[in-house]
């Protein structure tokens, strides 16, 4: 979703106020940041789970031509290859595990949706380039809680630390015993945090 489309969407909610609870393993957190920037003070609180920013050498950055390569594979009808490229380059899954993923029935479902993977890349923009986050992309004054899992990879903790420095009313809360899959494996833990944690 481009910024123009997102602005039209956000503009449709004039006069309404929101407490946004957005937990997502990929671009959903960034999309929530974009929406909160556009909606301004109509967003009263914002909750994010592990925005997957790559801002240093904690893992290999996503290639600069990532979106272009995804589109090329999809347009050529190479849907499985597009999913494999996404899993390898964006998610950072080692090659030795991808074969097991292909054997799972969910791989075919991912193939059916492979044409949408480029949208994810467009939303992420340069936030996975291995460079510092842009300082002027988001203007969010709402109290923001950035959640991380205790057992998650360092990149997610580094990303949270970088983002909390950019948002004036942001805080970090680490969920004990959780990792990046908590959105799927422990949604009740995230929900309780959203309900209980006062910003």
Name each region found by the language model.
Residues 1-23, 27, 192:
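Active-site loop/oxyanion-hole signature of alpha/beta-hydrolase fold enzymes
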Residues 1-2, 23, 30, 82, ...:
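Structured catalytic cores of enzymes that bind and process phosphorylated ligands/cofactors
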Residues 159, 183-198:
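Post-His helix in hydrolase/transferase enzymes
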Residues 34-41, 165, 192, 196:
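Short, well-ordered alpha-helices that flank and scaffold nucleotide-derived cofactor binding pockets
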Residues 106-166, 171-177, 182:
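Conserved serine/cysteine hydrolase catalytic core
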Residues 15-60:
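Conserved hydrolase catalytic core segment
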Residues 5-11, 69, 81, 85, ...:
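Alpha-helical elements of Rossmann-like donor-binding domains used by nucleotide-donor carbohydrate transfer enzymes
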């Amino acid at each position: 979703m481009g910024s123009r489309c997102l602005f039209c969407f956000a503009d449709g909610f004039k006069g309404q106020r929101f407490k946004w609870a957005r937990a997502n393993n990929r671009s959903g957190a960034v999309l929530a940041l974009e929406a909160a920037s556009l909606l301004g003070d109509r967003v009263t609180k914002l909750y994010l789970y592990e925005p997957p920013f790559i801002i240093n050498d904690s893992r290999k950055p996503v290639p600069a031509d990532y979106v272009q390569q995804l589109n090329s594979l999809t347009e050529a009808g190479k849907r499985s290859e597009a999913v494999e490229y996404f899993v390898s380059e964006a998610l950072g899954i080692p090659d030795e595990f991808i074969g097991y993923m292909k054997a799972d029935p969910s791989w075919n479902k991912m193939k059916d949706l492979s044409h949408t993977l480029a949208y994810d890349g467009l939303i992420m923009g340069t936030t996975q380039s291995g460079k510092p986050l842009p300082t002027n992309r988001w203007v969010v004054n709402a109290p923001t809680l950035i959640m991380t899992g205790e057992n998650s990879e360092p990149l997610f903790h580094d990303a949270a630390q970088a983002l909390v420095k950019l948002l004036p009313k942001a805080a970090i809360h680490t969920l004990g015993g959780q990792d990046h899959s908590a959105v799927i494996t422990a949604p009740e833990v995230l929900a309780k945090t959203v309900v209980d944690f006062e910003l």
